[in-house]
């Protein structure tokens, strides 16, 4: 949500962040952090986790340190105030509003402000100057702002008690395993574990965590990076080390389809790989994070796809947007409207560009059609619902990657749907065919 850390659309490019798959993280940061954490007295484990996570957060951009501190303080103090004024609804609403404005305000300023200014200038012919100094995003801001939002809302709903220890709360917000790619962890998911100081973890948990981390790393390095090279070879980018890239304008329609399929595989292995590494590291530290992916490419409908893809994000929007708006309890028209709001916000969450908004609305249309009449027919089929779903998902990823480096949105869709000549895929099938086959097997 957002090729560096993740495929470029999920996390806006950072200034050399400390990525899970880098040598310095694998052989320096992670071993040192785990050693300090395991050796620390029980009462100091959260302090060690908090401080090490701050180092991780500040590694690439220390100038964003005040942003994290401010976000922690705003939500920590607001949570205490909401609980303190339990018998005064107006004050409770006021402090909830403070927390929401603080979290959403920071997210909007860093991620969307310049996009809004550019869009207004383009639509109205104005000449508002863009804000300087926010060309890169604070690391993981799309993820940890949603965590602070859920915390403040849950305290307001009385679903959880406000955290009184600021170190514990800070450790929850900035916990490095889930900071850059999720899963999005609600406070109630880890609140009990944050307050278990002795016997938080055991050797079996550490072993399970190491296994999950290794599988996630393999997904990222052996599959995502390798199959992503096919997409890069096809589109070509200015700083690509490859000397064999074709360029989108020179690619034939079959080659572009091969490339977008490769991108779809890369996106899944990259994102799910990072999430799995995060879940694994959480287990090593004694925390059980929720699963984030469940073989989404085996889905037989778009509805099922969104139950399997980025499950913590879908669950977040369902709990904090869809259900409060009325969910499916207020009639079909209201349900479709609620779906529209959720999918629009999902697109906006993934990035500050119009292609993300189009991508979100694209899925709204598909989900609405399934709600209205398609689902009963899809449930009757065996093979064709899977083909239908995969085709539409791949087309969606083409929309998602539109306007990325080396990709022109209009040209990409022209190549996909208006048959054209150019470089054919035979050379790339010879070089990547086995890898593609293995990748398909590993995601089904």
Question: Each predicted region: which residue ranges?
Answer:
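Membrane-embedded transmembrane alpha-helical bundles that form the catalytic cores
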Residues: 2-443
């Amino acid at each position: 949500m957002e090729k560096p850390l993740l495929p470029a659309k999920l996390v806006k490019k950072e200034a050399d962040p400390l990525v899970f798959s880098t040598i310095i993280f694998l052989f320096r940061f992670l071993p040192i952090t785990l050693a300090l954490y395991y050796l620390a007295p029980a009462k100091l484990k959260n302090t060690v986790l908090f401080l090490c996570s701050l180092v991780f957060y500040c590694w690439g951009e220390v100038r964003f340190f005040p942003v994290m501190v401010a976000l922690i303080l705003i939500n920590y103090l607001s949570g205490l105030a909401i609980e303190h004024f339990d018998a005064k609804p107006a004050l409770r609403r006021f402090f909830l509003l403070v927390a929401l404005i603080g979290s959403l305000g920071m997210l909007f300023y860093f991620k969307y402000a310049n996009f809004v200014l550019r869009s207004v200038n383009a639509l109205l012919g104005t000449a508002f100057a863009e804000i300087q100094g926010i060309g890169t995003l604070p690391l993981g801001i799309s993820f940890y702002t949603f965590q602070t939002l859920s915390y403040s809302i849950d305290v307001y709903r009385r679903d959880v008690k406000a955290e009184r220890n600021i170190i514990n709360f800070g450790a929850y917000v900035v916990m490095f395993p889930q900071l850059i790619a999720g899963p999005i962890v609600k406070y109630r998911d880890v609140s009990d574990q944050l307050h278990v100081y002795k016997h938080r973890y055991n050797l079996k948990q550490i072993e399970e965590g190491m296994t999950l981390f290794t599988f996630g790393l393999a997904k990222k390095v052996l599959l995502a990076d390798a199959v992503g090279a096919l997409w890069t070879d096809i589109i070509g980018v200015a700083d690509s080390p490859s000397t064999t890239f074709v360029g989108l304008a020179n690619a034939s329609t079959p080659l572009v389809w091969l490339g977008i399929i490769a991108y779809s595989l890369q996106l899944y292995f990259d994102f799910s790989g990072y999430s799995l590494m995060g879940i694994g590291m959480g287990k090593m530290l004694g925390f059980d994070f929720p699963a984030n992916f469940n073989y989404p490419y085996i889905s037989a409908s778009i509805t099922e796809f969104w139950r399997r893809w980025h499950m913590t994000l879908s669950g977040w929007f369902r709990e904090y947007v869809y259900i409060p708006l009325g969910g499916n309890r207020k009639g079909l028209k209201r349900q479709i409207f609620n779906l529209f709001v959720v999918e629009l916000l999902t697109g906006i969450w993934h990035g500050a560009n119009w292609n993300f908004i189009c991508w979100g609305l694209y899925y709204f249309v598909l989900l609405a059609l399934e709600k209205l009449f398609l689902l009963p027919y899809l449930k009757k089929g065996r093979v064709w619902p899977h083909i239908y779903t995969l085709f539409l998902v791949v087309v969606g990823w083409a929309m998602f990657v539109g306007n990325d480096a080396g990709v022109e949105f209009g040209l990409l869709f022209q190549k996909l749907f208006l048959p054209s000549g150019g470089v054919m895929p035979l050379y790339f099938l010879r070089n990547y065919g086995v890898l593609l086959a293995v990748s398909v097997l590993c995601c089904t």
